[in-house]
A protein has these predicted regions:
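Short acidic/histidine- and often glycine-rich active-site loop of Leloir-type glycosyltransferases
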Residues: 193-202
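Short, acidic/turn-prone active-site loops that include or flank metal/cofactor-
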Residues: 2-7, 71-74, 151-153, 195-196
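Generic beta-sheet signal
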Residues: 1-2, 49, 69, 129, ...
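Conserved catalytic-core segment of nucleotide-activated headgroup transferases in glycan assembly
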Residues: 19, 56-59, 67-161
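Short hydrophobic beta-strand element within catalytic cores of glycosyltransferases
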Residues: 178-181, 188-192
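Donor nucleotide-sugar binding/catalytic pocket of nucleotide-sugar-dependent glycosyltransferases
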Residues: 6-7, 25-80
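Acceptor-binding helix/loop patch of EC 2.4 sugar-transfer enzymes
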Residues: 1-34, 96
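Acidic donor-binding loop of glycosyltransferase active sites
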Residues: 44, 160-174, 185-188
Length: 202
């Protein structure tokens, strides 16, 4: 089996305001970890995507030793077509936009970082590219300089429009495909420590 310990996210979600939310996510973490433990022990081999994930696995499910099988990226698909359409003030964020870590990360970035960037660079543009944007994500399209695309046929053209890719995730583990894809496109990436933690020395 290829494993990801989603139970590790629950304590982060439990930081949400309100005692009910904390209770729900605390309970969910315990139940999910018990399920993950049963599944891991039912398989003869387990694989994780990074050394960070392996250490987490060892800590949470003692006695089961996973192997590391890193994520890959299709370098032919994620290949830059050149700079003809590149906006020197453009930034791009990619991901499924009803996934809570993506929603949290991009909302935090627009609230905490974007105003200062726009004040310094009035022509700055941010493209939030990905399917199923929540109402909260769609609302970011009302912020000056921000465009929420919804689903697109392919992300490489959007990488080619931008001067930088961002990955401001606060709830993240493993290796982020959005980071690998941007790197494959030869695009600089500004990532949070959480989004970069599975990349080792890259």
């Amino acid at each position: 089996q290829c494993a990801e310990l989603d139970s590790d996210n629950c304590p982060h979600y439990a930081a949400a305001p309100g005692p009910l939310g904390r209770w729900i996510y605390g309970r969910e973490a315990r139940r999910l970890l018990a399920f993950e433990d049963r599944v891991a022990r039912a398989f003869s081999r387990s694989f994780v995507v990074s050394e960070v994930e392996r250490e987490l696995f060892r800590r949470c499910i003692p006695g089961v030793e996973p192997d590391v099988l890193p994520n890959g990226v299709d370098v032919e698909h994620f290949r830059s077509a050149g700079d003809a359409d590149r906006d020197p003030h453009g930034a791009v964020f990619t991901g499924v936009m009803d996934y809570e870590p993506n929603v949290d990360g991009v909302r935090w970035f627009v609230a905490r970082c974007w105003p200062a960037l726009r004040a310094r660079f009035p022509a700055a543009r941010l493209w939030i590219v990905g399917s199923r944007p929540t109402p909260a994500v769609r609302a970011l399209g009302d912020v000056p300089g921000v465009t929420v695309t919804g689903r697109v046929e392919a992300t490489p053209p959007w990488f080619d429009r931008a001067a930088v890719a961002i990955a401001p995730l606060r709830l993240a583990r493993g290796v982020q495909n959005k980071v690998l894809e941007a790197m494959s496109m030869a695009l600089p990436v500004v990532a949070s420590p959480q989004a970069a933690q599975g990349l080792g020395d890259l």
